[in-house]
Amino acid sequence: MISTVALFWALCVVCIVNMARYFSSLRALLVVLRGCDPLLYQYVDGGGFFTSHGQPSKQMRLVWYIYAQRYRDHHDDEFIRRCERLRCQFILTSALCGLVVVSMVALLIWH
């Protein structure tokens, strides 16, 4: 029989791997954004996005830009594809993180 604790840790590993994929895709999106739309790149603080002095309000602008699918009107097809991929990865990672939290609570109650 499969241990519930082992299953929980496997779920955590899958969640961490998907988070790494998400951040890697976000970094690649910012590189594409710098080339195709410098004003939007500056608007979302693309240069300081992954630094300690990054501005969270500008970072949230990019998150909401992608979440609201405002990229669909953009002129660059590669940028649109990367935004679609990033949006799907964000939804998947969010669902996995929620599942980890729910399973952690279930483990605490069960054991």
UniProtKB/Swiss-Prot annotation:
Pfam families, alphabetized: UspB (PF10625)
Entry keyword annotation includes Nucleotide-binding: no
Organism superkingdom: Bacteria
Keywords: Cell inner membrane, Cell membrane, Membrane, Transmembrane, Transmembrane helix
InterPro entries cross-referenced by the UniProt entry: Universal_stress_protein_B
Coiled coil: none
Transmembrane segments: 1-21, 90-110
Gene Ontology annotations for the cellular component aspect, listed alphabetically: plasma membrane
Keyword Hydrolase attributed: no
First-listed, main subcellular location of the protein, grouped into a coarse class: membrane
Subcellular location: Cell inner membrane
Topological relation to the membrane, as annotated: Multi-pass membrane protein
Assigned protein family: Belongs to the universal stress protein B family.
Protein name, as recorded: Universal stress protein B
Organism field: Enterobacter sp. (strain 638)
